Amino acid sequence: MRKLFALIIAILYISVAYAQPRAVFMGDSIFDSWDSTKHGGHPQFFKNNNFVNCGKSGEVTAQMVARFQRDVIDRNPDCVIICGGTNDIAQNKGYVPNRLIMKNIKTMTKMAEQHNIEVILCTILPAARYPWRPEIEPVKPIRNMNRRIARFAKHHHRKFIDFYTPLATKHGALQTPLSKDGVHP
């Protein structure tokens, strides 16, 4: 967990805290747990750095788009870190093709850019299975989505955080010492 925070810090520039947040973390349960001591997170990290955590457990990217105006644009942060898609792949709200997941990520990116908010895109974290949806085989869809996200970020000159590569086993699972359920670090 500390390595993930260190990676984020390395990407963000240092500035004095002020009224608007420096960064908004927009995502699902991966981010949701980062500022909760209940889940091993570090709420003081967010407070000390003027970051706002808008991770919502179980959400798909369409739900992230629906709240993007309120949670990101209205706060007018310097940047937004977007990490989502695993719940789409898990079919939490039904089947969602990868092209639609990517469309939602592009929509959030465009909304942020229209308001001069810097966008940092993240890969989907590795998972060999979803405990709540054992019939889903997520490895190939996650790898496919991560290629799409990386291509989009590179083509549009966006900052990009690859969580997948350092956290994945060669079989596409989240490394065991990092997780109790194989999905959440």
What spans do the regions from the language model cover?
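Hydrophobic residues at beta-strand termini and immediately following loops
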Residues: M26, C54, I161-F163
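Conserved beta-strand elements of the Class I
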Residues: V24-M26, V52, V80
